[in-house]
């Protein structure tokens, strides 16, 4: 039996587990680049974010391990040039958001998600548990750079694509976000 993992990070963990006697191969997950590509939209206009630097977070289910509360902290730290947009929140989570975070439940299609990635200036993925992490790959395909935490598979994916990896600390995220040179104050 050969074990297949979606990242070297998970392969290394597997080799340290009770499964270590089995060979392990890495096969990266892929995305559909006919969908995840630069996709023009009216997203900025629809949400009144024309002159903002959009800091995007995307998750299927938002919880602490996905970095939701790091976005709450970032909302207190970033000035009004920035707009945090989170996709994938529940209705309750949206109701509980700080006023300076825009929450979106789900997208209606992968194409809509690609348009949001394209509209964003940077994707932030502060997850502390990822076996691969599709969002940085999808964002990159749409022309949007990513900032991810180290010590997860996201680090491996981000480094291969020239993105930014920071220690698992909200202050490091803040420094990376504010250190980016955005064209035109938020319009890519």
Where are the regions that the model predicts?
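Carbohydrate-associated surface elements
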Residues: 9, 30
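A short helix/loop element that forms part of the nucleotide-sugar donor recognition site in Leloir-type
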Residues: 37-48
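Conserved donor-binding/catalytic core segment of Leloir-type glycosyltransferases
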Residues: 48-66, 72-76
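Nucleotide-activated donor-binding/catalytic signature segment of Leloir-type glycosyltransferases, i.e.
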Residues: 88-111
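Short alpha-helical donor nucleotide-sugar binding micro-motif in glycosyltransferases
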Residues: 115-120
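Aromatic "clamp/platform" in nucleotide-sugar-dependent glycosyltransferases that forms part
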Residues: 128
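Short hydrophobic beta-strand element within catalytic cores of glycosyltransferases
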Residues: 145-148
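Conserved acidic donor-binding segment of nucleotide-sugar-dependent glycosyltransferases
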Residues: 163-170, 178-184
């Amino acid at each position: 039996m050969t074990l297949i993992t979606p990242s070297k990070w998970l392969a290394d963990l597997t080799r340290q587990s009770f499964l270590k006697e089995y060979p392990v191969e890495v096969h990266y997950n892929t995305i559909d680049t006919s969908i995840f590509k630069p996709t023009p939209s009216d997203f900025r206009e629809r949400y009144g974010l024309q002159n903002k630097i959009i800091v995007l977070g995307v998750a299927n289910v938002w919880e602490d391990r996905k970095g939701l509360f790091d976005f709450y902290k970032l909302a207190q730290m970033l000035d009004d040039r920035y707009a945090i947009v989170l996709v994938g929140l529940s209705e309750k989570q949206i109701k509980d958001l700080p006023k300076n975070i825009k929450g979106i439940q789900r997208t209606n299609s992968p194409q809509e998600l690609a348009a949001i990635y394209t509209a964003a200036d940077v994707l932030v993925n502060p997850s502390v548990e990822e076996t691969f992490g599709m969002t940085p790959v999808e964002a990159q395909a749409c022309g949007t750079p990513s900032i991810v935490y180290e010590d997860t598979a996201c680090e491996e994916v981000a480094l291969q694509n020239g993105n930014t990896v920071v220690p698992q600390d909200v202050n490091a995220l803040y420094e990376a976000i504010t250190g980016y040179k955005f064209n035109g104050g938020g319009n890519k």
